[in-house]
Amino acid sequence: MAKSVATERALAGKGLVDIYPFKSLGEGLSSPDEIVLVDVGGGQGQVLEDMRMHVLELNGKKMVLEDLPKTVEDHVPLEDVDFVPYDFLTVEQPVKGARAYLLRHILHDWPDRICRKILLNTIPALVKGKSKILIVEIILPPVNPPIFGALMDIQMMNYGGGGRKERQWRAIFESVGLEIVKIWPTAKSDSVMELVLKSS
C-alpha cells in the first residue's frame, strides 16, 4: 500500500510541475535561509524530489517535508529538504513564513469541519502578502463528473470526506478567512487551488 501511494505521488508531482509555476517560489528571496515550500503530509518526498529535478529555480533552495513521526523517521535524505514530524490535525503549523504550503490529496479524506481545522492549523504560519496555500484536489463539475472523480467521491464518503464542487471548496476556504487567487487545472483530474489570506 505504501509503495503504491509513493508511486502515485511521484506521478502526480510530475503533473504538478508542468502546470503550476513553482519556479516563482524560488525568485526574489530575502534570505538564503528562506523556506520556499512546505509539503504537508508529503510522505517520503517524491513530489519535492521531482520538483528539485525539474524546476531549476528551486535547486539549492530550502524546502520542508512534514509527515507523521514514523514516516519521517523512515525517510531517505533529500538534498536541501528538511524532514519535520507534524500532525496537521492536532498541532499548529510549526514552520512559519514559508512561500507556500502544499496540501496534496489531504482535504478530500476529511469532512468539512476537519478540513477547516487543518486549514486553521496552517493559517497562523502565513505571512500576508507573501505566503500561500496550494491545495491539490479533484474539483467535481456541477454535472456529469468524470468517472475517476465520481468513484473517489463515493470511496471517501465512507470516511466522511469526498470530492467537492468548486463552490463547496470556496465555501470551506472562505469560512476560515482564505480566498482562491487562481485555479490551475492539470491534465488529469486534479486542480491546483492557490489560496491566500482574504484581503479584507
Language-model features: locations:
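Conserved adenosyl
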Residues: 1-145, 180-181, 185, 191
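C-terminal alpha-helical "lid/dimerization" subdomain adjacent to the S-adenosyl-L-methionine
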Residues: 130, 134-176, 181
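C-terminal lobe and adjacent flexible extensions of AdoMet/dcAdoMet transferase-like proteins
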Residues: 193-200
